[in-house]
């Protein structure tokens, strides 16, 4: 089962007050309900592919309204042949839709969210929970990117959902899609806040556990990469230094070098694997800092390069013994 499905399953087990149940129902029906007319009856079908959600919608309607409710199961014939669950109302439909602020007399559908209906903070949470159950999705936190969205067919309703989410400082944004509009979150912290708002505590804890482990792995990888890069840099520098010192040795001899350069040159080729700090501690003329050792080795690099370019030892500042 996907992370989104697990989250929705958790939400279907929540106990809510009657007032919050109405708001949750209103959001779900507003987004997943369909109205049809037959023999002067107003028929409402609420459709979902999630059995747990269908049971919740059925139970909420049954608890709130004393009307006959049908629960139908159909099988999709195209693509994924999943079951489709339909909660159907054939009587009292109009009154229920008006009570849920989805329909206004005489038969006008509301385009947005009734502000009075979501005045209380718990009602705001309930509406977002219903909207997420209806058409929400959230990426598994183990995937490469964080993403949570709620889809709506109507732009005005989508904008209202975005505004409702941002009353909780979620920094939600909207985007037009091919068949409608979405309100979405991209920041991990905001996604966990949203999960907390709608009451998905277990999903939130799982999301945070995975996110923390993922961030730790990323930090370790960055540290390892940085240390590897520094190690490679150190090794390359040591190889270059030894190569240059051996070139000086083979062309003019180390004896031509000034004493302070001659000593470090001899130590470097005799101790290829030691650090600059360790080289500084080996000097018989007195301990020298890491930066001081680095300065002397750079001077040896410069001498080798000048000799390679054709300059004479005298031009480089070296004294060649005639004996």
Curated annotation (Swiss-Prot):
Tagged with keyword Cell division = yes
The keyword Cytoplasm belongs to this UniProt entry's keyword annotation: no
What are the alphabetically sorted keywords of the record? Cell cycle, Cell division, DNA-binding
- Pfam families recorded: HTH_WhiA, LAGLIDADG_WhiA, WhiA_N
Q: Name one GO biological process term.
A: cell division
Residues annotated as DNA-binding are 275-309
Q: Which parts pass through the membrane?
A: none
Organism's domain of life?
Bacteria
A GO MF label: DNA binding
Q: Which residues form the signal peptide?
A: none
InterPro entries per the UniProt record, alphabetical: Homing_endonucl, Sporu_reg_WhiA_N_dom, Sporulation_regulator_WhiA, Sporulation_regulator_WhiA_C, WhiA_LAGLIDADG_dom
NCBIfam families listed in its UniProt record: DNA_bind_WhiA (TIGR00647)
**Which family does the entry's similarity section mention?**
Belongs to the WhiA family.
Cited function: Involved in cell division and chromosome segregation.
Q: HAMAP family, per this entry?
A: HTH_type_WhiA (MF_01420)
- Any idea what this protein is called? Probable cell division protein WhiA
Q: In which organism is this protein found?
A: Listeria monocytogenes serovar 1/2a (strain ATCC BAA-679 / EGD-e)
Q: What is the lineage of its organism?
A: Bacteria, Bacillati, Bacillota, Bacilli, Bacillales
